Amino acid sequence: MTIKFLSESTINRIAAGEVIERPASVVKELVENAVDASSTKINIILERAGKNLIIISDDGIGMTDKELEIAVERHTTSKLDESDFLKIHTFGFRGEALPSIAAISKMLITSKKRGTDKAFQIKLIGGNEKQITISVHNEGTKIEIRDLFFATPARLKFLRADKTELAVTVDIVKKIALAHPEISFSLTNDSKNLLKLKGQNKDAETNLKQRIIDVIGDDFIKNAAYIDFKILDFSICGYTSIPTYNRASSEDQFLFINNRPVKDKLLQVALRVAYQDYLARDRYPLCAIFLQIDPQFVDVNVHPAKAEVRFHDPNYVRNLLIEAIKNALANKSHVTSTTIASDTLKLFKNPLINKQPTINKEVNVNSKSVDYRSYSSANTPKILQNHICQKLIDTLPHAKVEQEVENRIEHKQQIHKQYKLGAAKAQLHTTYIISQTEDSIVITDQHAAHERLGYEKIKSYIKMDELIKQRLLIPEIVELPNEKRADCLYDHREKLSKLGLTLEKFGEKSIIVTEIPNILGDVNVQKLIQDLADHLSDFSENVALMELIEHVTETYACHYSIRAGRKLSADEMNALLRQMENTPFSGQCNHGRPTYIELKLKDIERLFGR
């Protein structure tokens, strides 16, 4: 077989295979072109999720007839020249999108250059038969794509159901819209409105906040920390959720480099590391984070789809992102998710709360049996109501309340006006602390809260190298389920020694413990070592010290904390609440669950129809 040149149409179809995978790819390329054209309004119309028809119209700078003819040729662009290849600020720069799309569809472009009198139209079928005619159009450009992949029918077999393809397109438009809150976007499919976003023209922070509310939701903003981080020519801004507001997947993580939406592993790992102290490993934060970096320090020309980037100094970027997120979270470290209280109140709601009892008009006064349920309290004389209530109260068994606790609480009536978590009023099921603030009640999980306090305390001791060892009077021998777990602990013995735990191997499946961290006090050594072995069984000997510290600290904190089922005095409960108010990230446990929920008085009153 001889070597020969490929035809232009074949080259374009091959290029389309790299750039255009599905209707969403077409929408992405054309919307990005519209953004680069300084548009303020971008409208997207689809039929069958774009399989039959895609129309993108904008009010950008438009094109002349000559520019229109050149635009559909390969490697033609207005966005790049040889001198600024390392300083790319625009979405597009390859000059491949239009000819690649034209090669596999029926394309019609209508455009009018700003400041000119005439509009022009060009029609292409499979990238051929170019026809330019005079047309009528407002300033800007409209591109119609029909019968996508008609020239490459094999690609149609790989398309998913309309619903799936549409979801991908909506996600792409949302990402671009987040990066450009100053632009209005609309998206319809089969005449159904899916997105309608109004362009914002206020200051940058307000614009971004409103666009995030429109795209991600108001709940996210209410439960997010604002990021504003700058160092030299590098800046990070946006919003990231507080730990108690999380998801089971990473779908709601929006990351941008110079306003370009990216899916970069380095940034995703940095995000994960920033939350590792506050979230369980199967939970993910929500975020919309924008990194601005000098274009010469980031390469966006890694893949035709431009979803991946390469940094000149990846570790520098990673560390700055972690620092920016942690700083933002520190400013919201005592806050718990606002949705928790509303979800809790829903559980209390009585489905019969709005149903008023009706009066039985056929009551026989001579009857010995009267159905009291048929009477409305509104029809009972007040004096009788009070009499009935008093009688009822007199028959109720009084709650057993320890006089000592009651007296102590009475002396602290004003605490709820001074402190965020209020004054302790009671302990529920020896597990939850009920406290009162000026306008709410707070329910605190004593174990989760104290575990968080312990975690932060132990972590600070480790950081300051102040973790004191306590020698056991009688060394403890701990037998583990198998030799693997015993070997795992023994392999990490030097690192564990730095964390206050001294141990040696004792037989095949046993470990002998001679020293433990002093802060753990009278801890159950058997349970501590078994839990540590469970945590570390999947770790290699070469695991990083910081990662080991995280897992060991979690285990220490769990054994350090007071347990559910322990009765606390009023002083102990109030002491715990005061510690929470003065400890960072006390609003969530080590797994991202809330340590307390706050129920506003007005919401409680609403439950009773007040």
Curated annotation (Swiss-Prot):
This protein is involved in the repair of mismatches in DNA. It is required for dam-dependent methyl-directed DNA mismatch repair. May act as a 'molecular matchmaker', a protein that promotes the formation of a stable complex between two or more DNA-binding proteins in an ATP-dependent manner without itself being part of a final effector complex. PANTHER family: DNA MISMATCH REPAIR PROTEIN MLH, PMS, MUTL (PTHR10073), DNA MISMATCH REPAIR PROTEIN MLH1 (PTHR10073:SF12). It comes from Rickettsia canadensis (strain McKiel). GO terms for cellular component: mismatch repair complex. Keywords: DNA damage, DNA repair. This is DNA mismatch repair protein MutL. One of its GO terms (biological process) is mismatch repair. PROSITE patterns: DNA_MISMATCH_REPAIR_1. The keyword DNA repair applies. The lineage of its organism: Bacteria, Pseudomonadati, Pseudomonadota, Alphaproteobacteria, Rickettsiales. It comes from the Bacteria. Pfam families: DNA_mis_repair, HATPase_c_3, MutL_C. One of its GO terms (molecular function) is ATP-dependent DNA damage sensor activity. Gene3D superfamilies: 3.30.230.10, Histidine kinase-like ATPase, C-terminal domain, MutL, C-terminal domain, dimerisation subdomain, MutL, C-terminal domain, regulatory subdomain. Belongs to the DNA mismatch repair MutL/HexB family. The gene is mutL. InterPro entries: DNA_mismatch_repair_CS (IPR014762), DNA_mismatch_repair_MutL (IPR020667), DNA_mismatch_S5_2-like (IPR013507), HATPase_C_sf (IPR036890), MutL/Mlh/PMS (IPR002099), MutL/Mlh/Pms-like (IPR038973), MutL_C (IPR014790), MutL_C_dimsub (IPR042120).
